[in-house]
Amino acid sequence: MEITSKIVLIILLVVMVAASIALYHSMFHKAKNAYDKISFRETMNLAGLPIVTFRQGESKFNFILDTGAFSSIIDYRVLDKLQYTELEGKSIGYGIDGKEHSISRVGIVLTYKDKDYSDVFRVLDMSTSFDALKRDYGVTVHGLLSSSFFERYKYVLNYNELIAYSMV
């Protein structure tokens, strides 16, 4: 009986080790099997920033991926080039001066590789920041995608492969 118990124990250990290796392998290579991938490799190589180009019709719009931002932002200067829906009610924001500001919100649908993405954007004057990015890095930025976007679409940023991916 003792030999049988040892054999069963060894088999169980081998199965557990194999299952652990399989789990590690699937977790490590998740991004390769992701359902949706958004690459930011090119802009990381050029500017050191995670920027993705989306389309609306024939027009292209560049967005910084910012998981730390509270809400997505669109520069007011590009609204005339976009189709959007004005949303009722304003959001409240605070300027660098500490004063409260009323901010317009719009709903925008953008496309990346034949998949549509929608988000709510605060409309702000981003000319100082975005013009500095253009001057210093040579990249035109039209907006910023925030944590709300990543939460809605269950995206994770993978800086090893320079992609945002979703498993849902």
Q: Residue ranges of each PLM-predicted region?
A:
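Pepsin/retropepsin-fold aspartyl endopeptidases
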Residues: 2-168
